[in-house]
Amino acid sequence: MKPTPEALLQRLKQHFPDAHITVQDDSHHHRGHAGAAGGAGHFAVTLVSPVFAGLSTVRRHRLVYDAVADWMPHRIHALSIRAEVPGN
């Protein structure tokens, strides 16, 4: 079963307490998709935090994936990530 957007937001806030975070549930765009059939969600997240300063895009995404690793792939099937520093 997929997490609610609010549950995903809270999980990300635990790992990135100083970040501005938005979560969008895109699961409805994927009806009939193999991952959606199992109940796992499709989400788009944006995080803006100074913690990402000096990090490559790959490293930024890895930090976000690490925060939800135990939810993938059974609760989250797809996660689109924008991880930026303030002022970008």
Predicted features and spans:
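A generic structural motif
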Residues: V51-A53
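Solvent-exposed beta-strand sheet faces enriched in polar/charged residues
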Residues: T22-Q24, T46-V48, R82-E84
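A generic structural signal for short beta-strands and their flanking turns/coil linkers
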Residues: P17-A19, G39-F43, R75-L79
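N-terminal first-folded block
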Residues: M1-G35
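C-terminal structural segments of small proteins and small subunits
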Residues: L55-N88
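A short, structured beta-strand/loop element
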Residues: R31-S49
